[in-house]
Amino acid sequence: DMEDPYITYTSKYMETVWWLIKQIYNKDLMYKGYTIQPYSPKAGTAISSHELNQPGTYQDVTDTSVTAQFKIINENLPDFLDNKEDIYLLAWTTTPWTLPSNTALTVGSKIEYVLIKTYNQYTYKPIEVILATDLIQKLFSGNYFEVSHESELLEFESKSNKIPFYISNKFIGKDLLGLKYEQLLKYALPAENPENAFRIIHGDFVTTSEGTGIVHTAPTFGADDALVAKQAKPQIPPMLVKDKNGDLVPLV
């Protein structure tokens, strides 16, 4: 209606929006939550989808990815993981600056995973890790080679050019759900319900096309992360901490 358009900066429009919000509030349909929104540090405001679709906004860039080790808490483990050795989950991320805000690890319930026994390529100490079966060749290539028997691992010497690895067990992501792990960077805890953090959850977005099949999850920063955290039962809390005014703010 070009003769009578609505214009967002007019008093009539703004008063109408506030009236609608009041009706929603009076019907007890409004609640306080936390969502992930594009934000402009320069403008100090959220950014609309229209602004994000302006020419030149999106660019193809090369990301640096990180594979981090998360240590499983050795309590009430399923039989296929119940041993006396430390086990680490290999989680992949292209946003390593969000690792201090990690509160969950996400797997695919139907994806097949493996427990691998090998040696740390930096310390040459024995280590056991979990990752997706389909990504073994991507992560364990170059300096690594597979052996058929666990006993062959004992033949490894730190001066060797090649590091052996042995597939100890196979299972699906569903078997890992609910397992707890140690917080990676212990700077702070979520201000609310920290006891529900640092556990393995399911996410439909997890694939085996790249990474490890285990996704570092920081609900404070990622839209997908925030969604799966809210869908988890109980919900995964975001890494929000209280500032000097007692307000919950992201840990950056």
Predicted regions, residues:
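Conserved alpha/beta enzyme-core scaffolds, especially Rossmann-like or related mixed alpha/beta domains
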Residues: 1-46, 60-72, 93, 200-211, ...
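Non-cofactor substrate-recognition interfaces
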Residues: 1-8, 79-89, 96-252
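Polar, glycine-rich mid-to-C-terminal structural blocks
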Residues: 29-30, 59, 66, 70, ...
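Amphipathic alpha-helical
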Residues: 25-54, 59-61, 150-171, 175-184
